[in-house]
From Swiss-Prot:
GO biological process: translation
Name assigned to this protein: Large ribosomal subunit protein uL23
GO cellular component: ribonucleoprotein complex; ribosome
PANTHER family hit by this protein: 60S RIBOSOMAL PROTEIN L23A
Subunit architecture: Part of the 50S ribosomal subunit. Contacts protein L29, and trigger factor when it is bound to the ribosome.
Gene: rplW
Secretion signal span: none
Molecular-function GO terms, alphabetical: rRNA binding; structural constituent of ribosome
Tagged with keyword Oxidoreductase: no
Function: One of the early assembly proteins it binds 23S rRNA. One of the proteins that surrounds the polypeptide exit tunnel on the outside of the ribosome. Forms the main docking site for trigger factor binding to the ribosome.
Keywords on record: Ribonucleoprotein, Ribosomal protein, RNA-binding, rRNA-binding
Amino acid sequence: MNAERLMQVILAPVVTEKATFVAEKNQQIAFRVVADATKPEIKAAVELLFKVQVESVQVLNRKGKVKRFGRFVGRRRSERKAYVALKEGQEIDFAEVK
């Protein structure tokens, strides 16, 4: 896989109450990823960027909600999330990552 493509796959970590709960309970980390990212690409990107070993990747597509803006109807953007499980003894410290 192209290293340049792998650098663009992961957009941001998801920092929500639910993501924190999942991280503590299942030792998984949630990331927002590009819409056309595949599981092998996500795994390779996490291993390249954070220097950790990935055990598994679970992916979900969240549809954007329909919202009203005054008299106009709009739509929030859809997003793709990846829950990445790290191998035993591995962890990512976001404070150290540059």
